[in-house]
Amino acid sequence: MAVPWLVLLLALPIFFLGVFVWAVFEHFLTTDIPATLQHPAKLRFLHCIFLYLVTLGNIFEKLGICSMPKFIRFLHDSVRIKKDPELVVTDLRFGTIPVRLFQPKAASSRPRRGIIFYHGGATVFGSLDCYHGLCNYLARETESVLLMIGYRKLPDHHSPALFQDCMNASIHFLKALETYGVDPSRVVVCGESVGGAAVAAITQALVGRSDLPRIRAQVLIYPVVQAFCLQLPSFQQNQNVPLLSRKFMVTSLCNYLAIDLSWRDAILNGTCVPPDVWRKYEKWLSPDNIPKKFKNRGYQPWSPGPFNEAAYLEAKHMLDVENSPLIADDEVIAQLPEAFLVSCENDILRDDSLLYKKRLEDQGVRVTWYHLYDGFHGSIIFFDKKALSFPCSLKIVNAVVSYIKGI
């Protein structure tokens, strides 16, 4: 009986080492590290760890042990959360939706500014615990009441779970601002990555809601604002740049929208979108809307392949405004609150920010744009990770803080 256990104990280290070696090889064979990125060795290390954990998660999923998303979330939620003596942090539930409330302890002579925060993570990663440090910092430095919303994620929940949970929790909070000591004229909606998509979609959905306080401003940190044009210059230039490759994004997009992975190539090639739809939205999606300086490297003009009706029937909900808020009607865009947009040069989603910026400005919406030439997708989450932090991480956080304090 002891022999099988001994063999297993000897085999496990070899297995884990083998997976790590494979992850390192995959990184160096498939990953691009642009020259503008600072601390490239640090980013390489983080990406190798990321690939290692995702690969382990996928193996565990195939063995029926645990799904990859749940495995990763278990790991990042195991990090100890530090208490801040300046804040009261309370975990609540708005119906079935978990939320975390950050409130300054210091007395205030007037109602405070409110922030509603939607975290990122491609609907795969991210949680209240994972983004605790960032939200804690934002609440403390801006002296605001901050509500972070924990929405349902993969693999158990698909579209429109994120939108529904963030929308319902936001409405609940907006109806109870007085309870939390929040000034209804100073509510900011903030989100990162797919959380930025939620910001865009929810601020649009709240347009015309006379029964709720009007959102004062929206903060979108490298958001994804459209789900069907994946050949923009930044998608081509940064398709293999960590921490969000085009391949991983398309896979996550298909999983969240419940699209069979066999249609990934059709989505990449644009064959799942009818020609008349391309013509309708070309004015908003055209690379001509992107400044020339962003198209100087690694971009080849592109046009969609022949229309595939079967792919369209499978993936047509990509065109819903909840999933692609960039294509909302002008009448809706014109009524949106002012925006603070963060984009990173080394990010496949850079051009989403640039295109949404133009859409807002064309409709008279005030936009403050903050672009980081040394930035990459997901960098903000490392701002408080000390040795694993990057200069761009703190730059983004401080820029967001400075903007919100001006509200």
UniProtKB/Swiss-Prot annotation:
The keyword Transmembrane applies. Pfam families: Abhydrolase_3. GO terms for cellular component: membrane. GO terms for molecular function: carboxylic ester hydrolase activity. Signal peptide: none annotated. It is a single-pass type II membrane protein. Glycans are attached at N168, N269. A motif (Involved in the stabilization of the negatively charged intermediate by the formation of the oxyanion hole) lies at residues 119-121. Belongs to the 'GDXG' lipolytic enzyme family. This is Arylacetamide deacetylase-like 4.
